[in-house]
Amino acid sequence: MASKSQHNASKAKNHNVKAESQGQWGRAWEVDWFSLVSVIFLLLFAPFIVYYFIMACDQYSCSLTAPILDVATGRASLADIWAKTPPVTAKAAQLYALWVSFQVLLYSWLPDFCHRFLPGYVGGVQEGAITPAGIVNKYEVNGLQAWLITHFLWFVNAYLLSWFSPTIIFDNWIPLLWCANILGYAVSTFAMIKGYLFPTSAEDCKFTGNFFYNYMMGIEFNPRIGKWFDFKLFFNGRPGIVAWTLINLSFAAKQQELYGHVTNSMILVNVLQAIYVLDFFWNETWYLKTIDICHDHFGWYLGWGDCVWLPYLYTLQGLYLVYHPVQLSTPNALGVLLLGLVGYYIFRMTNHQKDLFRRTDGHCLIWGKKPKAIECSYTSADGLKHRSKLLVSGFWGVARHFNYTGDLMGSLAYCLACGGGHLLPYFYIIYMTILLTHRCLRDEHRCANKYGRDWERYVAAVPYRLLPGIF
C-alpha cells in the first residue's frame, strides 16, 4: 500500500483516535473466554503435541495410533514410553548452544554484504512498517547471508573435513528437542518480564490483565536488546528457518546411511522446502511488512513457536521418510513437483504484485495493464492520518488472500511426496490450512476496523478470500 501521512491538527482528538486505532494492529486489549481457553489449551498441549509426533516416529515408526493403542490395551504404559525417550545430553546441549550463539553472531555482528553483489536482492539496513505508536524501526537484513555462510560451513565440515557426521542432527533429534524447549520458554519468559520492567517502546505494549494471555501472545510489539537485536526478526528467521534446510539435509543423509540411497520423495521434500526457505531470506525485507512483524506481539506464541514448533513440525515429512523411504513413480513425482512449483509461483507472484504496486505507488503494469485499486484512509494511534490503496488487479483481483492459496498448494505438495501410508506427514497441510484461514479472518477483522467503509468497497470488488467461487 502506498501511504502518505499528514498531521492531525486537533490534539484534543488524539486520545479517542488512539483508542479507536488499537483494533488495527496487534492482539486484543480484552480477553474473551474462548480466547483464554484456547490460550491455556495451547500452553498445556502444544509441547505435548510436538513430543508425541517425534516420539511416535522414534518408537512407533511414525504411527500416530500405535502409542494410544499400546497404552489403551496395556501393552505399554506412559512410564514405559517416557523411559524409552532419550534425555537431554551434554553433547546436544553443547551443539544447541553453539548453534544459537553462531546465529546470534551472524545476525548481530556481521553486516550484510550480499546486497552489494547480488542483483535484485535488498539487504542491509531497512525500515519496517509503522507501529501503532507511530514508530518506524530499522533492521539489519542479513538472513540470506547467514543462510549461505551456515550451509557453506556445514558442507565443508561434514563432507570435506569430516569434523562431524551429516546425520548429526537426526542422531540427536530428541535431545535437541529438550534444548529447544528450554530456549523457547526462556526467551518467552524474558520477553514478558522485559515488557513489564524495561520495554523498548512502552507506547507499543499491550496489557490485558490476564497472565496467561499476556504470556502467550506477548506484551511488547518489538522487543529489542540494544539498537539492532530485534527479537521478532531473529527468532522468526534464525535459528529455526536457517536450520530447516539443514535438518532436511541431515534426514537425507540418514536415509542414505540406512538404505544406501536417497529416494526421490526425500529429494522432492528437500528441494521444495529449500525453495521456500531461500525465498523467505531473499525477500526478508518484504517480510518486515508482513503480519508477524506488523501485527503480532512477541510472546510464547512466537518465542517458543519459532524455537520448537517450527523446526520440529515443519520438517515432519523428511523425518517420516527416514523411517519410510517412499519411492514415487515418475508420474507421481512429476505431479508433486509441478504442484509445488505452481504453488510457489502463485505465492511469489502474488506477493510480488503487491510489492511492485507499493513501490511504484501504482505506476506499473500488472498482467499487462495499469492496476486498479480502492482508495482508503485510516488514522494511527499517534493521530496521523494515512492514505492507502488496496490492490484489486492481478492475483489480488482473483481472491483477497491468493498468496495463502499458493502457500497451501506448496504445503500439500510436501505432504503428497510422502505417499498415503500414514497420516503423520499430512499434519503440515492440516495445520497450515487452519493457520492461514485463521490469519485470513483475523487480518480481515483488523482491516474492517482499520478502513471501515473503504474495506466494504474492497470486499465488494474482490468477493472471495482464498478459493474463487468457493471461499
Curated annotation (Swiss-Prot):
Gene3D superfamilies reported in the protein's UniProt record: 1.20.120.1630
Catalytic activity: cholesterol + NADP(+) = 7-dehydrocholesterol + NADPH + H(+); 7-dehydrodesmosterol + NADPH + H(+) = desmosterol + NADP(+); 5,6alpha-epoxy-5alpha-cholestan-3beta-ol + H2O = 5alpha-cholestane-3beta,5,6beta-triol; 5,6beta-epoxy-5beta-cholestan-3beta-ol + H2O = 5alpha-cholestane-3beta,5,6beta-triol
Domain of life: Eukaryota
GO molecular function (one): NADP binding
Tissue: Highest expression is detected in liver, followed by kidney and brain.
GO cellular component: endoplasmic reticulum membrane; nuclear outer membrane
GO biological process, alphabetically ordered: blood vessel development; cholesterol biosynthetic process; cholesterol biosynthetic process via lathosterol; lung development; lung epithelial cell differentiation; multicellular organism growth; positive regulation of ferroptosis; post-embryonic development
Cell compartments where the protein resides: Endoplasmic reticulum membrane
Cysteines paired by S-S bonds: none
Keywords associated with the record: Cholesterol biosynthesis, Cholesterol metabolism, Endoplasmic reticulum, Hydrolase, Lipid biosynthesis, Lipid metabolism, Membrane, NADP, Oxidoreductase, Steroid biosynthesis, Steroid metabolism, Sterol biosynthesis, Sterol metabolism, Transmembrane, Transmembrane helix
Residue ranges of the TM segments: 36-56, 95-115, 144-164, 173-193, 233-253, 262-282, 302-322, 327-347, 416-436
EC numbers on record: 1.3.1.21, 3.3.2.11
Membrane topology according to the record: Multi-pass membrane protein
Residues holding NADP(+): 354, 358, 391, 396, 403-404, 443, 447-451, 458
Biochemical pathway: Steroid biosynthesis; cholesterol biosynthesis
Record family assignment: Belongs to the ERG4/ERG24 family.
Summary of subunit composition and partner proteins: Interacts with DHCR24; this interaction regulates DHCR7 activity. Interacts with TMEM147.
Record's function text: Oxidoreductase that catalyzes the last step of the cholesterol synthesis pathway, which transforms cholesta-5,7-dien-3beta-ol (7-dehydrocholesterol,7-DHC) into cholesterol by reducing the C7-C8 double bond of its sterol core. Can also metabolize cholesta-5,7,24-trien-3beta-ol (7-dehydrodemosterol, 7-DHD) to desmosterol, which is then metabolized by the Delta(24)-sterol reductase (DHCR24) to cholesterol.
Name this protein carries in UniProt: 7-dehydrocholesterol reductase
Lineage: Eukaryota, Metazoa, Chordata, Craniata, Vertebrata
